[in-house]
Curated annotation (Swiss-Prot):
HAMAP family: GARS. Pfam families: GARS_A, GARS_C, GARS_N. SMART domains: GARS_A, GARS_C. The gene is purD. Its cofactor is Mg(2+); Mn(2+). It comes from Pyrococcus furiosus (strain ATCC 43587 / DSM 3638 / JCM 8422 / Vc1). Mg(2+) 1 binds at Q275, E287. This is Phosphoribosylamine--glycine ligase. Its EC number is 6.3.4.13.
């Protein structure tokens, strides 16, 4: 049996763990709190901060694992892959240097510029408030202001959304320069965002089905940005507003990225996630993530037909082949504590009827919750509906939520026809009429 160490204890990692066990792995987990879903399927469980590299390596050596699979971004930034590889333990996940695609936004933008990656945005990095203000005034169009490190997607502010105008953008950018020493300013791109995740063996990429995330806290895409309140994917692995040509361009961006990383001496092995904006001119890369999306990992792993252990071994050995996914639609809805993300309640027990959820045909994924169903303050559970069409998948996920009771909060509109029509409408306003893909 292949012994696999999984680092991380969120919903994404529960989905990864289930896929590894289904592929025949003997699973070992290290995370800062015990995920009840992972605890049920793991041979052993080590409690430690995922960024405590020495501790992670210690567990890996104690359990004599064959390889590691890294779930979240923080341990990648901490260099957990480098440390494991130094001890002869291969990993699915990029080294600290390769993970800069996510962990250092300025480096990533400069890398894209150096290598002429298609779909890149206009950007500037500033450490001088005066220069920054002059540039924004001269640019004269709406901008996006981004902090440079890992922010869990929460520090990015866009003119016309979180910022009233470029004047407010200058104030926020100045605050970030004072706080972090630097700030990243980009042109604003209008359109609809989508997620394109690929497996990478260092030289080539293999695509997964596209997904679309719902980052805003509240229905109708308003409110603060969260880690993601849910996501959907379509049975044809595209999205209703994406053409085959858009898909090919986005894939080219990711393939060229991996080729350029190899050329620069940082072979990228693991999962690469491109967050794209579909603009009127085609897909623009908003940012990279150096790991699976959470929730989008749950969508794609729910319909993975091939064996994740074998895929992982091929990533490590550098000989990836195409990967098969079933032609099913998926809807993932996250359940969070009331008050999330700004002021979530914690320490309260909720009722979860797992048998009834299964009877609805849904899967239950555990995240920030303990084995007594006590809320730990972040997204707690995800319910997953899988069916031949999106309506049916959404119904399954929605009906499962009835069997979770307590001070919870979720978005009813994730994966609904209305919410998707809204996105199609945005694209039609930018591109004119087009043939919509069925989902």
């Amino acid at each position: 049996m292949v012994k696999v160490l999984l680092v991380g204890g969120g919903g994404r990692e529960h989905a990864i763990g289930e896929a590894l066990v289904k592929g025949g792995a003997e699973l070992y987990v290290v995370s800062k709190h015990k995920n009840p879903g992972l605890a049920r399927i793991a041979k052993d469980y080590g409690l430690a901060r995922e960024t405590d590299v020495e501790k992670v390596v210690e567990f890996a050596e104690k359990w004599k694992v064959d390889f590691a699979f890294i779930g979240p971004e923080a341990p990648l930034e901490a260099g957990v892959v480098n440390a494991l590889e130094e001890r002869g333990i291969p990993a699915v996940g990029p080294t600290k240097e390769a993970a800069r695609l996510e962990t250092n936004k300025a480096w990533a933008r400069e890398f894209m510029e150096r290598n002429k990656i298609p779909g890149r945005k206009l950007f500037r990095v500033f450490d001088d408030p005066k220069e920054m203000k002059e540039w924004i005034d001269e640019f004269g169009k709406p901008v996006v202001v981004k902090p440079l490190g890992l922010t869990g997607g929460k520090g990015v502010k866009v003119v016309g959304y979180q910022l009233k105008d470029n004047e407010e953008a200058k104030e926020y950018a100045e605050y970030l320069i004072r706080k972090d020493g630097k700030v990243l300013i980009e042109e604003r791109t209008d359109g609809v965002e989508f997620t394109f995740q690929v497996f990478s063996d260092g030289k080539k990429v293999v695509p997964m089905p596209l997904a679309q995330d719902y980052p805003h806290a509240y229905e109708g895409d308003v409110g603060p940005i969260t880690g993601g309140m849910g996501s959907y994917s379509c049975s044809n692995h595209l999205l209703p507003f994406i053409t085959k040509s858009d898909w090919e361009k986005a894939l080219e961006t990711l393939q060229k990225t991996v080729e350029a990383m190899y050329k620069e001496g940082y072979p990228y092995k693991g999962i690469l996630y491109g967050q794209f904006m579909l603009s009127k001119d085609g897909p623009v890369i908003i940012e990279y993530n150096a790991r699976f999306g959470d929730p989008e990992a749950i969508n794609v792993l729910s319909i993975l037909e091939d064996n994740l252990v074998e895929i992982s071994e091929r990533i490590i050995d550098g000989n990836l082949r195409d990967v098969k996914f079933s032609n099913m639609a998926t809807v993932v809805k996250y359940i969070a504590p009331q008050g999330y993300p700004e002021n979530p309640i914690k320490g309260v027990r909720i009722e979860v009827n797992e048998d009834k959820i299964r009877e609805e045909g849904a899967r239950l994924i555990f995240a920030s919750i303990d084995e007594n169903y006590t809320l730990l303050g972040s997204r707690a559970l995800a319910v997953v509906g899988v069916s031949e069409n999106l309506e049916e998948a959404e119904k399954i996920a929605q009906s499962a939520i009835r069997h979770v009771k307590g001070p919870i909060f979720y978005r009813k509109d994730v994966g609904t026809r209305e919410s998707i029509e809204k996105r199609i409408k945005i694209m039609k306003s930018l591109r004119g009429d087009f043939d919509v893909n069925s989902c």
